[in-house]
Amino acid sequence: MLERLSEAFKIQRQFTENAAHELRTPLSLMQIQLDLYNSGKHPGNDADTIQTIKMLTEQNERLSKMVKTLLDMSELQTVGRDEMIIVNALIDEVLADLEPLAQEKNIKLIGKCKDVNMVGSDILIYRLVYNLVENAIKYNHYGGQVIVEAYQKEKQVYLSVEDTGSGIPEELKERVFEPFFRVDKSRSRELGGVGLGLALVNEIVRVHDGSIAIRPNPSGGTIIEVQFAVNRTTAVSYTHLRAHETSQDLV
């Protein structure tokens, strides 16, 4: 039974990867044509044409992000996960990278991180934290705050991201990590989301043999907590594989 289930998941991942690869080329060609058109002047265009071109450009960019995330999800298993990660330093970097986005909504980013190390993939854990904090900013109230906390208890690393937004309805908490699921579809479209950010987070947690949950927050907002074992494999030297500009392409 387990072998059949594993094979089914393997086929599903392969299909997703193949579909994403097939979509990438036509989307790139459309983006090139749209970029060429947008780089020129078209004084004869009426308001409807301008709006249509704008919509096509935005939707093509959205689909391109979706394809990139699907490819990332299909390739997670191939990424090495034996680096020693300085978690508090990584979180500081994420907060610095997302500070401009937070400033747009006057949101305060707060790091409460003790000296914590764990074994895993530096580039994947960065993306996990980035996606969680980015979500917490996007779905927060203007003038709110985002608190990122990391600490070690016994042989477990705990990482949590808390926001002061509207929170997630109890009946939807089990579904927020599903691909393409959105709590508020209209708001997600407005913010440019494709419904894969938390699904990618969930997959990163899975390949690190961790767990993720939404914790109760009496003061409102959302708390997402991730838990990892400190030493899931034998550690090797700490390396920083991610180029700084990688963060600009995240979903």
Cite the ranges covered by each PLM segment:
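Short alpha-helical segment of the dimerization/phosphotransfer core of two-component systems
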Residues: M55-L63
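Short conserved segments within the C-terminal catalytic ATPase subdomain
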Residues: L101-I110, V116
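Short helix-loop "hinge" at the ATP-lid/N-box region of the Bergerat-fold HATPase_c
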Residues: A136-I137
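Short beta-strand/loop element within the Bergerat-fold HATPase_c
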Residues: G143-K155
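Short conserved segment of the HATPase_c
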Residues: I168-R182
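Conserved small/polar residues in nucleotide/adenosyl-binding loops
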Residues: T239-T246
